[in-house]
Amino acid sequence: RDVQDIASIHKEKELGRLMELLALRTGNLLNVSNVSSDLGLDRETTEKYIAILERLFLVRRLPAWHRNRAKRLIRTPKIHVVDSGLAAMLNQLKTGDWISHSGDFGPVLESFVVQQLICQAGWLADDLNFSHYRDKEKVEVDLVIEQGRDVWGVEVKRAASFNTSDGAGLRKLAAQAGGRFKGGIL
């Protein structure tokens, strides 16, 4: 019903399928061409429907971080389902699946953490900018937080312990940000 108030949708069923597909890809890079192809929709319609889901606060595009601000505009964003419970339900994940389907929970956990940090930032007086980092070697940081020129990284892991290789993305981000890098959380 809210969808009809926001935009004229000609294929309501496809909008639901899109939401389900985005839930399956939460926490991953958003390739609109692949999504369009998988749903049998043209790219323009897919872009329009994703924008509608964003306006309904169901999904969030997390832009890519690059030290060159112009390059941020052309890098691939990640897609996150805003409600991690909805993402888990659409992924057909149950509480007991935490261990047996652990690979499926990682992206949902990442989306949860990203959304919680963005929501909590609303309480701050200073504006924060949020993005993700991924280089050509596919080394990534799940969340990059900027306050002015200062940069922090957050890497989400679904594990009780970690090893030094888990911090590779944070080290790469620190190298890219240089003196602007203020710290990271793993």
Give the predicted meaning of each segment.
Residues 1-151:
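Accessory nucleic acid-recognition modules appended to NTPase machines
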Residues 94, 157-158:
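Short, histidine-centered active-site or binding-site loop motifs used for metal coordination
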Residues 154:
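Conserved beta3 VAIK motif of the Hanks protein kinase fold
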Residues 158-186:
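Catalytic cores of nucleic-acid endonucleases
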